[in-house]
């Protein structure tokens, strides 16, 4: 809020401040605006209310001042009067209809303001006009919260007397008692508790009033609460007690009081941290730590991640506290979950004094920690040279590697502090040592662009052309130092984008310095790694323009030669990763811009595929061809740009194309850019291609148009754009399917309706594909009810045409009962008798698949139960042969299917059930057979059901057959033709037994 000069204000405002009613009357008489606004949108009435001058307020209101005017914080004159505790001003404003419920931007009413400012008399005037004193502000706080927060006992008394909810909570579930306890208002705390406030109440994070008082060091409130017998070790959601909170905030007086009252000094929180851990880490926790240690706190207790209090002092460099812990039995070489001792942690964070304390107390400098690293590794890695000096000791094997084979010199090279490197080298560190990947310290220094480290290592004899296990030299790593990673790291420290960019530029200059130094010291830029890439490839891949310029200048061999042996050229790598500046450097060399990678792709193809517009523009400006096809998919850069919807790249490519047919170029599958754009749903790309007059009716090798693909993939806006181009809707693919077939199959009812209207207006419209299936077949097969309704609105679909496996068959075979109902309702029940080319009815299909509900639906529409197909089988036979017990049950018991019907091989339903080993089906059929002759009925092989059941091991069925009079002496065809003993069902049964 700005502070305004009174002399700069209107005369009326100055007169109000001077308190002269006569001058005010004179100014008003001279038509001075009584509702004038200052820069904060405050009116003269706000001023008078602030001053509490009732007479002037009355005068202004009678002269037309708006009594409920709001400033830019939405404060009314009543808010101002209440804040000034002027009872008379409040009464005058209310007399003139001031809104007692008005809210400011924080949703605070005049009562909130009165409560916060101890305006008791004003509150007494306002409260009778309110429906409730428990109205909350934006933070959920009531007037009682504000009164308690500010310690106004009289106001708290008034509000409680007027019905304020003593346990009302704000949006963080904090009560008035929390706020009073936090602020140390003992009288208010006592008053609230005496009026029934819940002393053990918790907010959303589980903090009690005791936690609140302890956190802010309110010792008197803490004592009062403890005297009331509150649970001293009550925890919040993080498992922290009041003692934890007091230690964390360095409230030593509270800590002392809590300990005296018996608080558990070793209580762990959810992460296993005790109050001692917090005291060890806290900025002001030194005295707290002393108190805890002197009162029996376990100095070696470890958290869930293995950290002891000594570890915590090491993180934050609390060396005095570390001495206290050690003197009281703290284990110096205690390890955490990662294997780190306090010495490792202190080395990691560079706390030299603490390191000195630990070493003096006998800490093991050669103890292995995370990844088997020494404390010296961590100090060197984090560039703490003074710590390194402290950690070096006589007899220490300085070249001992960690888990990955890295020595301390490797760590120092990665950390970038040249003093660490010099210190280690002077102590005998071997710069020839390699890690498990074959990398020397020089590789690490180069990868992190630490120029002075590189300089020191090379000067002392490091081999600049030493290769690691992947064949990479320091030059490879310097050329590939990741600017994007460095940018991310820098971004955490710099919010300003300009500063961030400057930092990035400095880092790239440092990379160039490193590269230049290596080249000056005979680094060979033509050395290739095991994949055939040299330093130029790496610089291109990571977009280092200056490094590229330097390498190209220093490389005697031609640029094209550098590509041999590599799967991708530097041009490909720069284009793929979007490094247009690096690309521009490469383009200055006389190279073939259409050079291909191992898959035949050009740099332009890769740039277009990734959507790097600036790279695409640079390449086409230098003459790169947009028509080169790769070796695999035969796509062009046009196809590549469309696949991922990179419309800007596509536009650039189309604008450069001389040939108008470029827009319809095809890949190996015959797909045009338009087809791909539609298939992937890239609306802007589709719009651009149509604008460039792409052929909407071009077909691929499968005969599909863009419309086919759009409907298959379901991209609505793309399809709509194609339809607006008068695309052919009856064009058939290689299987004879039109877009209507696909719309019906995919359930796109809206498109289907639109396509139908267009199709029916054409004279020659054939709705059958190569197998005779119509859109209605496909809609029924896939259960698309909305599409079926659309199709049945057309007369031509209310009769079955095409493949004799009718739409009803299609619906039934996939258990789409609702679709079948639609067909039966729209046509008539006679369709239940239709047959496919094998003579099977829909009932056969239902029985075959055991779709019981569909079966019942067909039977309700008088489906012929005993109709036989071309092989003489009824629906019952079909169900029995396939073991569909549900269908058999309905057909036998409800539909009373004929059990005597025989197929071409004279098999009855019972024969078929037994032949496939379907015991349940056989028993269901047997239950309905009473005729002994049917039990002994023979098929073409002279086999009775008993033969078949016995041969298939159906013991229960055999027993039931015998019980119903099956003949055990019947002879089948095989037995009658043999010369040996006759085989009867009886012998088969005996074998089974």
From Swiss-Prot:
Extent of the ANK repeats: 7-36, 40-69, 73-102, 106-135, 139-168, 172-201, 205-234, 238-267, 271-301, 305-334, 338-367, 371-400, 404-433, 437-466, 470-498, 531-561, 566-595, 599-628, 633-662, 669-698, 702-731, 735-764, 771-800, 803-832, 838-867, 871-901, 905-934, 941-970
Keywords of this entry: ANK repeat, Repeat
Alphabetical list of SMART domains matching this protein: ANK
InterPro entries assigned to the protein according to its UniProt record, in alphabetical order: Ankyrin_rpt (IPR002110), Ankyrin_rpt-contain_sf (IPR036770)
One Pfam assignment: Ank_3
SUPFAM superfamilies in alphabetical order: Ankyrin repeat
Keyword Transcription regulation part of the UniProt annotation: no
Top-rank taxon, per record: Eukaryota
UniProt keyword Repeat present: yes
Subunit (UniProt): Protein phosphatase 6 (PP6) holoenzyme is proposed to be a heterotrimeric complex formed by the catalytic subunit, a SAPS domain-containing subunit (PP6R) and an ankyrin repeat-domain containing regulatory subunit (ARS). Interacts with PPP6R1.
Protein task: Putative regulatory subunit of protein phosphatase 6 (PP6) that may be involved in the recognition of phosphoprotein substrates.
Protein name: Serine/threonine-protein phosphatase 6 regulatory ankyrin repeat subunit B
């Amino acid at each position: 809020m700005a502070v305004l000069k009174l002399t700069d204000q209107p005369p009326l405002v100055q007169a109000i401040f001077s308190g002269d009613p006569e001058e005010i009357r004179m100014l008003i008489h001279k038509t001075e605006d009584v509702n004038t606004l200052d820069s904060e949108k405050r009116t003269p009435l706000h001023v008078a209310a602030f001053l509490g001058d009732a007479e002037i307020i009355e005068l202004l209101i009678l002269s037309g001042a708006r009594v409920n005017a709001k400033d830019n914080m939405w404060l009314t004159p009543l808010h101002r009067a209440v804040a000034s505790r002027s009872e008379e001003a409040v009464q005058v404003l209310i007399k003139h209809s001031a809104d007692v419920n008005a809210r400011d931007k924080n949703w605070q009413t005049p009562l909130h303001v009165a409560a916060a400012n101890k305006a008791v008399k004003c509150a007494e005037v306002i409260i009778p006009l309110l429906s409730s004193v428990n109205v909350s502000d934006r933070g959920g706080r009531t007037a009682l919260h504000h009164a308690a927060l500010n310690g106004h006992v009289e106001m708290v008394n008034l509000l409680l007397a007027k019905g304020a909810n003593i346990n009302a909570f704000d949006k963080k579930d904090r009560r008035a008692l929390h706020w009073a306890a936090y602020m140390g208002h003992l009288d208010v705390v006592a008053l609230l508790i005496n009026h029934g406030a819940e002393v053990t109440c918790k907010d959303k994070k589980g903090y009690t009033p005791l936690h609140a008082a302890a956190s802010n060091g309110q010792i008197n409130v803490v004592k009062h609460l403890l005297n009331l017998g509150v649970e001293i070790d009550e925890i919040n959601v993080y498992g922290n007690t009041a003692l934890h909170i007091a230690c964390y905030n360095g409230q030593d007086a509270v800590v002392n009081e809590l300990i005296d009252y018996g608080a558990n000094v070793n209580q762990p929180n959810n992460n296993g941290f005790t109050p001692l851990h917090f005291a060890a880490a806290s900025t002001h926790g030194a005295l707290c730590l002393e108190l805890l240690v002197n009162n029996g706190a376990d100095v070696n207790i470890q958290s869930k991640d293995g950290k002891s209090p000594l570890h915590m002092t090491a993180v934050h460099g609390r060396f005095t506290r570390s001495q206290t812990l050690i003197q009281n039995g703290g284990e110096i070489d205690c390890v955490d979950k990662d294997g780190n001792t306090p010495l490792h942690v202190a080395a990691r964070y560079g706390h030299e004094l603490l390191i000195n304390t630990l070493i003096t107390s006998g800490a093991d400098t050669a103890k292995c920690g995370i990844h088997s690293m020494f404390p010296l590794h961590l100090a060197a890695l984090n560039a703490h040279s003074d710590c390194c000096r402290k950690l070096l000791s006589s007899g220490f094997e300085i070249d001992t590697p960690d888990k990955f084979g890295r020595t301390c010199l490797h760590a120092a090279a990665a950390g970038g502090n040249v003093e660490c490197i010099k210190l280690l080298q002077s102590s005998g560190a071997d710069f020839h040592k390699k890690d498990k990947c074959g990398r020397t310290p020089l590789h690490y220094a180069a990868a992190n662009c630490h120029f002075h480290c590189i300089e020191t290592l090379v000067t002392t004899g490091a081999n600049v052309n030493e290769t690691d296990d992947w064949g990479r030299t320091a030059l490879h790593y310097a050329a590939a130092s990741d600017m994007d990673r460095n940018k991310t790291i820098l971004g955490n420290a710099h919010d300003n984008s300009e500063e961030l960019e400057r930092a990035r530029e400095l880092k790239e200059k440092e990379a160039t310095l490193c590269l230049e130094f290596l080249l000056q010291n005979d680094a060979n830029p033509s050395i290739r790694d095991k994949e055939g890439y040299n330093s130029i490839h790496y610089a291109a891949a990571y977009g280092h323009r200056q490094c590229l310029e330097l390498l190209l200048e220093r490389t005697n061999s031609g640029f094209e030669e550098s590509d041999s042996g590599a799967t991708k050229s530097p041009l490909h790598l720069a284009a793929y990763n979007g490094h247009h500046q690096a690309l521009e450097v490469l383009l200055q060399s006389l190279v073939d811009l259409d050079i291909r990678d191992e898959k035949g792709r050009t740099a332009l193809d890769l740039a277009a595929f990734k959507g790097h517009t600036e790279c695409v523009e640079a390449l086409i400006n230098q003459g790169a061809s947009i028509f080169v096809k790769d070796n695999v998919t035969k796509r062009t850069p046009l196809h590549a740009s469309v696949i991922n919807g990179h419309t800007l790249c596509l536009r650039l490519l189309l604008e450069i194309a001389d040939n108008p047919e470029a827009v319809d170029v095809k890949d190996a599958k015959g797909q045009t850019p338009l087809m791909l754009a539609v298939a992937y749903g890239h609306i802007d790309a589709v719009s651009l291609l149509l604008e460039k007059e792409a052929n909407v009716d071009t077909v691929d090798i499968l005969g599909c148009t863009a419309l086919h693909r759009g409907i298959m993939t379901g991209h609505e806006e793309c399809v709509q754009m194609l339809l607006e181009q008068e695309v052919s809707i009856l064009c058939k693919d290689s299987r004879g399917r039109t877009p209507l077939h696909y719309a019906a199959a995919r359930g796109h009812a809206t498109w289907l309706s639109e396509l139908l209207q267009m199709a029916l207006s054409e004279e020659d419209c054939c709705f059958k594909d190569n197998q005779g299936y119509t859109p209605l077949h496909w809609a029924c097969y896939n259960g698309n009810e909305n599409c079926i309704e659309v199709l049945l609105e057309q007369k031509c679909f209310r009769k079955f045409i095409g493949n004799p496996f009718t739409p009803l068959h299609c619906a039934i075979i996939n258990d789409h009962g609702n679709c079948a109902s639609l067909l039966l309702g729209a046509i008539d029940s006679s369709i239940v008798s239709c047959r496919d080319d094998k003579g099977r009815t829909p009932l056969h299909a239902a029985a075959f698949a055991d779709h019981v509900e569909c079966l019942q639906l067909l039977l309700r529409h008088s489906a012929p139960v005993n109709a036989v197909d071309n092989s003489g089988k009824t629906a019952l036979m079909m169900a029995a042969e396939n073991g569909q017990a549900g269908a058999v049950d309905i057909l036998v018991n409800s539909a009373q299917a004929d059990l005597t019907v025989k197929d071409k091989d004279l098999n009855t339903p019972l024969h078929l059930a037994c032949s496939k080993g379907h015991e349940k089906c056989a028993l269901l059929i047997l239950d309905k057979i009473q005729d002994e002759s049917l039990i002994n009925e023979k098929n073409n092989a002279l086999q009775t059901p008993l033969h078949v059941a016995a041969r298939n091991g159906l013991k229960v069925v055999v027993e039931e057959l015998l019980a119903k009079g099956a003949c055990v002496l019947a002879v089948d065809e095989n037995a009658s033709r043999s010369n040996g003993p006759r085989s009867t069902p009886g012998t088969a049964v005996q074998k089974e037994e």
